[in-house]
Amino acid sequence: MNYSIIFYIIGWILNLEAAFMLPSCLVALIYQESSGWSLVAAVLLCLLIGLPLVIRKPKNRVFYLREGFATTALCWIVLSCVGALPFVLSGYIPNPVDALFETVSGFTTTGASILTDVEALPHCLLFWRSFTHWIGGMGVLVFLLTLIPLAGGSHMNLMKAESPGPSVTRLVPKVKSTAKILYMIYMVLTIIEIFLLLFGGMPLFDSITLSLGTAGTGGFGIKNDSIAGYSTYCQVIITIFMILFGINFNAYFLILIRKFRQAWESEEVRAYLLIIAAATLAITFNVRGYFSSFAQAFQQTIFQVASIITTTGYATTNFDLWPEFSRTILVLLMFVGACAGSTGGGIKVSRILILLKTVKKELIQLLHPRSVRRIQIDGKAIEHEVVRSTNVYMGVYIFIFAFSMLLIALNNFDLITNFTAVAATLNNIGPGLSLVGPSGNFSMFSDFSKLVLIFDMLAGRLELFPLLLLFVPNTWRRF
């Protein structure tokens, strides 16, 4: 294990976090909020620890996959712990576990909250809370790849460890250039959404914070009723952009280089859009009696379907009051998730496709034992290693899900609350059903249960393995 390079990267992450906190400090200055000092204190702490780690450059900059996984997990833990300080120091979330839960929920783009009154927070902390979504959405280490030089294939090893999905695709030969392209697309889409929301009459602060949450598919609102209080136009714009940010960013790159047909022929993107369409139609007909018109039922339904499948977690209505059929579909969408290579969470549509095609292959193999078939997506054969890792991922996912449910059951809440609480955190969604539904929150859980759910949020965002490898002794052995 190359410890020097790990500390070097952590130092960069702390300095980067200090820079990311500066806009929130500016917001505190604009609104003349005294709680801004807590952000300044966190910035100084980041620099105090981060600068010495960066100044001492490692002699060996070789960065293998083992270091990639360990560094990714450690960076996200450090990022979250320091990011929680403004909430604790300001006194708005005095319990460190609660503050950590809120911050991890932000960075992992989960959007689950322990706050009972969001509107009580000052503007600077509301902005920081939403900005953590944007930082974590594309990945803080992906951003770091655009800034620091590393040896050999080190950039790819970092990107593999943090990027969502069963495999990582380079858009261009250089990984550093790929990271820059991804962030450019990310920023442009975010800015477009901000302007469209402003055009609809939404206040500037609201437009920025909600766009940051949409871009990262996070879901932290700045109002107690989430998005319900905004106009239909604004809700439609947010719906569109939730769907857009749930699409594999490779598709946008293909569109930019005028490969429109190749972008549309993506099996994952088409399956993702088909699932949204089918779920929307099914739920709309099921809940049409709950709204004044079919059009309103459709608009509310597609918003919630987009919010859940992209794992954003915004709400315009209390869908926990919908019929069981509709609630069941929404719970299933929690597991499906968005496309790989997007900012969304969940199992990912690409993994679902691989699993379904694996089942199909095995069934045909039973009927025709001598036949040789390979799993294909977009006309290309999927490597056996990708299929194997997908199967292992699902096995580990089920184990973590079941064990987490068992642990939080010690709180003695109902089964639906426990089940959807784990589903909402492990899949990085935010709201669940029952006590953790859109009108509830996670404040009633014990500190122990919150720590379990914090682990789930980090595990879900990092695709399980980077976090689990921290507990494997072989990870920490020197070369």
Each model region followed by its residue ranges:
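Membrane-proximal intracellular helices of multi-pass ion channels
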Residues: 1-479
